[in-house]
Amino acid sequence: MKHFLSLLAFVIITFATQGTSHMLINVDHYEALGFLRPEPIFLLGFIAILIQGTIMTGCLHLLAPEGATIRLGLIVSLGFGLFLSSYISFASPAKYDVPSIWEWVAVELSVSAIQFIFFGLALGFIHSLFKAKTKSELKQAL
């Protein structure tokens, strides 16, 4: 159940942050790129979100199988967030002719920071709700 709830939280938080950035706040920023599809294929992005969320909740469980803390949730989320956002923030403007490299970096890093901070809080909180009381309870939960 904790993995399902964590994955659901990641989907909601990702759509809230990235969707708001792409479709409301930074529309001109993304339209200026000139290579985006007129109609994005949301299924492919959704698959990526599911894979990323599954990996993060699984890693937190491996790190703290008897129950995590909000602090550990933040560490896992921010670690993966830094890993994932480093490509989009730095490698993408190196390859693509973005109008302003520093604007690109600022937008991508700030939105990613918001996304992964909120998810880290949610991830740690959700996992903390499922703390095993004894080793036998832990074995039953697995």
Predicted regions and their residues:
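Juxtamembrane/disordered regions of integral membrane proteins
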Residues: M1-L142
